Amino acid sequence: MVEYILLIISTALINNFVLVKFLGLCPFMGVSKKVETAIGMGMATTFVLTVASLSAYLVETYLLIPLEAEFLRTLVFILVIAVIVQLTEMIVHKTSSALYRLLGIYLPLITTNCAVLGVALLNVNLSNNLVQSVLYGFGAAAGFSLVLVLFSALRERLVAADVPRAFQGASIALITAGLMSLAFMGFTGLVKI
């Protein structure tokens, strides 16, 4: 049980996919202008990442390995992720049309979010079992959501701040992301396995 909790903590905080592995930067920079949008995107990505990790494990274990078709892994994972994202998009559209409009193009773009595919491929490469795969996906999603919400809150404050003209826009956003990455480096050494 402790091993699973440490897996979630290390994936979310220490080996954060956005700040350490630099995966998922497109939605990180694109959807992080408002906290409400970031929370919605975080919830959608959490669902997709967790289910994609489970699905990737099942497809790898019960389809690709028995058929000796591991060379199709990336293509099959992309197709599985696309199906999961379409399901998520339909659920969000039916449950919250306001959130659906706020997320706009970024909801279907979860399909091409490299963090989703990266987590699925890393799960296979790390030889995680079923529970570890799901928790790894959930931890990665929790870390992504945490960083996305924190970054969007910082960006909302930057709008009201007196930022020099040369640093306005993407420049100050990248500097802020770099400072967040430095802050998350403080978690290094938190989990000893």
UniProtKB/Swiss-Prot annotation:
One of its GO terms (biological process) is electron transport chain. GO terms for cellular component: plasma membrane. InterPro entries: Ion_transpt_RnfA/RsxA, NqrDE/RnfAE, NqrDE/RnfAE_oxidrdctase. Pfam families: Rnf-Nqr. The chain crosses the membrane at residues 5-25, 39-59, 65-85, 102-122, 134-154, 171-191. The keyword Transmembrane helix applies. Keywords: Cell inner membrane, Cell membrane, Electron transport, Membrane, Translocase, Transmembrane, Transmembrane helix, Transport. Its main location: membrane. It is a multi-pass membrane protein. The keyword Cell membrane applies. It is an enzyme of class 7 (translocase). Its EC number is 7.-.-.-. It comes from the Bacteria. Belongs to the NqrDE/RnfAE family. Part of a membrane-bound complex that couples electron transfer with translocation of ions across the membrane. The complex is composed of six subunits: RnfA, RnfB, RnfC, RnfD, RnfE and RnfG. This is Ion-translocating oxidoreductase complex subunit A. The gene is rnfA.
